[in-house]
Every structure is written in structure tokens, then in C-alpha cells.
């Protein structure tokens, strides 16, 4: 199947809409799995008689490995999409999400006597889902294809809105479906896999290729010398470092929030689902505000403001921990 590039006019907007829906539906599955995962991992950890500290570390790894794989593979997906087109890579990554979320559902349905296998498959599925989830990089490339440099930042805000919307509705679905997921733990992975399948069908049958034909990528797939030279550019290397630290901080926040609220305030899992949903709602609002704010303020100013708010928010959580547990 040969895809045609988008043309000028309304078609780029349609491409952006499809990318938005694709990212949103895929991240909706991520949002369903995220708050439920500690609850599903803990019985297997208890069956192995793992200490509380070690259990917290293992759950942290299950969370953080997803973001780590996204960070590593996002530029790889982007590079591959430059060579082979956006659509094939988007399809491949969404197919990976379908498979690895289904594998997660199988892992959490295993009996407690197979705790080691279950945890191993959970880890493997999170690694695979993280690699597949790096499709956000391909989505960003699509936005770059369809927008002018002046409007590119506003276009990229669509990814933030899609992420926030998925992060809001996913935990809410988990909240209202908790009783069902307790009886059928495989349902979490199955639902996430089904949602990714819907996104995959959108990518296969609705999305049109946006990479301009004739724009050839470099023959080398990877060049260490070129990578090092690019990273030495302050504008590039500095941004990548900032991005890594921000994502690393947020991933650790995601991994520890549920255990922190349980220890500090005795909050139940379903209460934490609502907390995650509230975080997602804030992400949606922030993404929506970015577009009008980008007209008045520079990208550097907005990035700085966002980082300052992250410092204040995460620092506030650290202060709460210190006050409660000193």
C-alpha cells in the first residue's frame, strides 16, 4: 500500500487530527495501566516474600523502564521515519503497543505460584510498550511535516493535550472499572491493547503519509561522530539534557506517588486513580494554554516557567515527606 503525502489546505489539519486521535487513544491505554500496575504487582512480590523496600524498588523499575525506553527510542523512531516514512513507523509502533499490552494482561493473570515468571513478563511488556510508545517521536515528525516553523510549537502542543487527555480519562476508566479488574486482572492489558488496536486501525486506514517524497534521509542510519557533534551544540545538547531530567523527574514522581500517598495519608488505590486523573486534567489545561501563550511569550520563557513549576511542585512533595516522616 503506497501512501500519498498530504497536500496543502485542509489536509494537513486532517493529518494533525488523526495524529492527535492516534496519540490520545494510545496514551489512554497507558493511563489505564499506570495506576493499576502497583496493585497488580504487589501480590506477586508478596508471594516471593520480597521486602517492602525491595518491592518499592521493583515497582519503580516497572514504571521507569517505560519512560527510559521512550527516551532512548524516540530519536530512533524519528530517524527510521525519515527513511521509510511516517505511516509505516506509526503502524509498527502501534502494533507493538497492541502486542505488549496484551502480554501485560497475560502476565498479571498468572497464578501467584508463578510469581517470578509474572514479574519477568511484566517487566518485558513494559520495556516493549516503552519502545513502542516512542511513536510520540514519529507523531512529532508528522506535526513538523504539516506546520510552518512559526506554528510548529503550537502544533507540538497537541501532543501535550493528547497526553493529558489520555492521562485523565485512563485513570478514570481504571477507577470505575476497578471491581471488574479485580475479578479479571487481564482486563487491564486487554483494554489497553484494544485501544491501541483502534489507534492502529486509524493509522492503517485513515492516516496519510506526510513525508515529502524526494526528501531523502542520510545514507548512514547512525553515526557516532555526527551524534557527538550535534550533542556538543549548546542548543541541542542542552535541550536534550533538560528534556531527560524533566522526564526522569516526572517518571519518578509517577512511580512513587501512589506509595507515598498511601504511607502519608492512608489513601486507597482508587483514591490515587483520581489523583492521576487530576494530574492529567492539569496537563490538558497546560497544553491548551500553550497555544495562546506562545503568541505572547518566547518558547524559552514558557519552558523556563514550566520547569520552575515542576521544581516547586516536586519540591513541595519532598517537603511534605520530610515533615511527615522526620
Regions found by a protein language model. Give the residues of each.
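Short amphipathic helix-loop junctions that connect adjacent transmembrane helices
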Residues: 35-56, 255-271
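Cytoplasmic helix-loop-helix junction between adjacent transmembrane helices
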Residues: 119, 123-162
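C-terminal ends and interior cores of transmembrane alpha-helices
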Residues: 95-115, 309-326
Amino acid at each position: 500500500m503506497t501512501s500519498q503525502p498530504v497536500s496543502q489546505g485542509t489536509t494537513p489539519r486532517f493529518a494533525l487530527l488523526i495524529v492527535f486521535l492516534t496519540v490520545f487513544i494510545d496514551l489512554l491505554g497507558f493511563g489505564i495501566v499506570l495506576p493499576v500496575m502497583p496493585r497488580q504487582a504487589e501480590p506477586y512480590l508478596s508471594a516471593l516474600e520480597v521486602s517492602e523496600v525491595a518491592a518499592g524498588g521493583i515497582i519503580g523499575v516497572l514504571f521507569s523502564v517505560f519512560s527510559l525506553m521512550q527516551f532512548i527510542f524516540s530519536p530512533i523512531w524519528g530517524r527510521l521515519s525519515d527513511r521509510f516514512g511516517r505511516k509505516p513507523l506509526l503502524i509498527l509502533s502501534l502494533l507493538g503497543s497492541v502486542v505488549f499490552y496484551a502480554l501485560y494482561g497475560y502476565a498479571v493473570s498468572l497464578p501467584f505460584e508463578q510469581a517470578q515468571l509474572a514479574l519477568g513478563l511484566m517487566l518485558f511488556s513494559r520495556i516493549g510498550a516503552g519502545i513502542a510508545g516512542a511513536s510520540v517521536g514519529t507523531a512529532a515528525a508528522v506535526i513538523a511535516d504539516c506546520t510552518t516553523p512559526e506554528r510548529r510549537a503550537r502544533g507540538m502542543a497537541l501532543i501535550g493535550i493528547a497526553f493529558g487527555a489520555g492521562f485523565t480519562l485512563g485513570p478514570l476508566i481504571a477507577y470505575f472499572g476497578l471491581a471488574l479488574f479485580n475479578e479479571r486482572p487481564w482486563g487491564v492489558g486487554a483494554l489497553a491493547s484494544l485501544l491501541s488496536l483502534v489507534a492502529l486501525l486509524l493509522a492503517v486506514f485513515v492516516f496519510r503519509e506526510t513525508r515529502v517524497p524526494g526528501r531523502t534521509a542520510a545514507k548512514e542510519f547512525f553515526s557516532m561522530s555526527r551524534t557527538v557533534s550535534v550533542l556538543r551544540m549548546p542548543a541541542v545538547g542542552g535541550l536534550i539534557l533538560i528534556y531527560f531530567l524533566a522526564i526522569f523527574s516526572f517518571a519518578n514522581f509517577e512511580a512513587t506517588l501512589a506509595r507515598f500517598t498511601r504511607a502519608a495519608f492512608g489513601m486507597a488505590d482508587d483514591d490515587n486513580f483520581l489523583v492521576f486523573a487530576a494530574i492529567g486534567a492539569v496537563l490538558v489545561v497546560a497544553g491548551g494554554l500553550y497555544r495562546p501563550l506562545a503568541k505572547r511569550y518566547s518558547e524559552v520563557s514558557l519552558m523556563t516557567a514550566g520547569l520552575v513549576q515542576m521544581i516547586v511542585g516536586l519540591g513541595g512533595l519532598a517537603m511534605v515527606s520530610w515533615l511527615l516522616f522526620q
